[in-house]
Amino acid sequence: MERTERWALIHAELMAAFKLLPSNTVESDNGYRKEDFLDYINANELLLAMEELDGVIEDNPIPSKEFWLHLISASKLMSNKHLAKYESVLNAT
Protein backbone atom coordinates (compact mmCIF):
# COMPACT_ATOMS: atom_id res chain seq x y z
CA MET A 1 0.00 0.00 0.00
CA GLU A 2 1.33 3.42 -0.91
CA ARG A 3 1.96 5.96 1.81
CA THR A 4 -0.67 8.41 0.54
CA GLU A 5 -3.25 5.62 0.36
CA ARG A 6 -2.44 4.58 3.94
CA TRP A 7 -2.69 8.22 5.09
CA ALA A 8 -6.12 8.51 3.47
CA LEU A 9 -7.32 5.37 5.27
CA ILE A 10 -5.96 6.61 8.61
CA HIS A 11 -7.58 10.01 8.04
CA ALA A 12 -10.92 8.32 7.32
CA GLU A 13 -10.72 6.19 10.48
CA LEU A 14 -9.88 9.19 12.65
CA MET A 15 -12.66 11.30 11.17
CA ALA A 16 -15.13 8.45 11.68
CA ALA A 17 -14.12 8.26 15.36
CA PHE A 18 -14.34 12.05 15.70
CA LYS A 19 -17.88 12.07 14.27
CA LEU A 20 -18.96 9.63 17.00
CA LEU A 21 -18.14 12.08 19.78
CA PRO A 22 -21.22 13.76 21.25
CA SER A 23 -21.64 17.50 20.77
CA ASN A 24 -21.35 18.03 24.54
CA THR A 25 -17.90 16.43 24.80
CA VAL A 26 -15.90 18.16 27.53
CA GLU A 27 -12.63 19.72 26.35
CA SER A 28 -9.55 20.44 28.46
CA ASP A 29 -5.83 21.11 28.23
CA ASN A 30 -5.10 17.68 29.72
CA GLY A 31 -7.47 15.73 27.50
CA TYR A 32 -9.21 16.42 24.22
CA ARG A 33 -9.63 19.68 22.34
CA LYS A 34 -11.67 19.73 19.15
CA GLU A 35 -9.68 22.63 17.69
CA ASP A 36 -6.38 20.81 18.28
CA PHE A 37 -7.71 17.62 16.69
CA LEU A 38 -8.86 19.53 13.61
CA ASP A 39 -5.55 21.40 13.37
CA TYR A 40 -3.61 18.12 13.52
CA ILE A 41 -5.81 16.27 11.05
CA ASN A 42 -5.72 19.18 8.58
CA ALA A 43 -1.91 19.32 8.83
CA ASN A 44 -1.74 15.53 8.26
CA GLU A 45 -0.26 15.06 11.74
CA LEU A 46 -2.17 11.82 12.07
CA LEU A 47 -0.48 10.43 15.17
CA LEU A 48 -1.06 13.68 17.05
CA ALA A 49 -4.67 13.72 15.85
CA MET A 50 -5.15 10.16 17.09
CA GLU A 51 -3.61 10.99 20.46
CA GLU A 52 -5.86 14.04 20.75
CA LEU A 53 -8.90 11.85 20.20
CA ASP A 54 -7.84 9.29 22.77
CA GLY A 55 -7.51 12.12 25.29
CA VAL A 56 -11.29 12.32 25.37
CA ILE A 57 -11.31 9.76 28.22
CA GLU A 58 -9.63 12.26 30.56
CA ASP A 59 -12.79 14.31 31.12
CA ASN A 60 -15.63 12.28 29.61
CA PRO A 61 -17.31 8.91 29.89
CA ILE A 62 -15.58 6.24 27.80
CA PRO A 63 -16.77 6.56 24.19
CA SER A 64 -18.54 3.75 22.34
CA LYS A 65 -16.92 0.53 21.16
CA GLU A 66 -17.26 1.80 17.61
CA PHE A 67 -15.09 4.82 18.49
CA TRP A 68 -12.32 2.53 19.78
CA LEU A 69 -12.60 0.21 16.79
CA HIS A 70 -11.85 3.19 14.53
CA LEU A 71 -8.81 4.12 16.65
CA ILE A 72 -7.66 0.49 16.58
CA SER A 73 -7.93 0.42 12.79
CA ALA A 74 -5.97 3.67 12.52
CA SER A 75 -3.40 2.33 14.96
CA LYS A 76 -2.86 -0.82 12.91
CA LEU A 77 -2.26 1.34 9.84
CA MET A 78 0.35 3.29 11.85
CA SER A 79 2.55 0.36 12.89
CA ASN A 80 0.42 -0.43 15.96
CA LYS A 81 0.99 2.88 17.74
CA HIS A 82 -1.03 2.72 20.99
CA LEU A 83 -2.72 -0.51 19.85
CA ALA A 84 -2.46 -2.26 23.23
CA LYS A 85 -3.94 0.76 25.01
CA TYR A 86 -6.89 1.00 22.63
CA GLU A 87 -7.60 -2.72 22.78
CA SER A 88 -7.50 -2.57 26.57
CA VAL A 89 -10.01 0.30 26.67
CA LEU A 90 -12.22 -1.50 24.14
CA ASN A 91 -12.23 -4.65 26.27
CA ALA A 92 -13.20 -2.58 29.32
CA THR A 93 -16.26 -1.05 27.61
Located regions from the model:
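C-terminal-biased regions
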Residues: 1-93
